[in-house]
Amino acid sequence: MLVLSRKANESIKINSDIEVLILEIKKDAVKIAIKAPENIKIFRSEIYEFIIEENKKSLLKDKHNISKIKSLFNHYFKNEN
């Protein structure tokens, strides 16, 4: 992990296309701006973790639904023969 010190109105570059600018420093918060290409997704970490958890839940539901559909198809095709 790289640790840097920056003052208000200073920035860091990540590669050539991402810039993190320190806008304001308060006692208990730092306001930052991130300039990045539109195809780069940027999330607050708590939002990102929520998205990951929701995706996992969705996969479990899909797995359950696929099992139900498979069971229905098996039942249908057994009765066809």
Swiss-Prot record:
Signal peptide: none annotated. One of its GO terms (molecular function) is mRNA 5'-UTR binding. Keywords: Bacterial flagellum biogenesis, Cytoplasm, Repressor, RNA-binding, Translation regulation. GO terms for cellular component: cytosol. It holds the Pfam family CsrA. It comes from Borreliella burgdorferi (strain ATCC 35210 / DSM 4680 / CIP 102532 / B31). It comes from the Bacteria. It is found in: Cytoplasm. A translational regulator that binds mRNA to regulate translation initiation and/or mRNA stability. Usually binds in the 5'-UTR at or near the Shine-Dalgarno sequence preventing ribosome-binding, thus repressing translation. Its main target seems to be the major flagellin gene, while its function is anatagonized by FliW. The gene is csrA. Homodimer; the beta-strands of each monomer intercalate to form a hydrophobic core, while the alpha-helices form wings that extend away from the core. This is Translational regulator CsrA. Belongs to the CsrA/RsmA family. GO terms for biological process: bacterial-type flagellum organization; mRNA catabolic process; negative regulation of translational initiation; regulation of bacterial-type flagellum assembly; regulation of carbohydrate metabolic process.
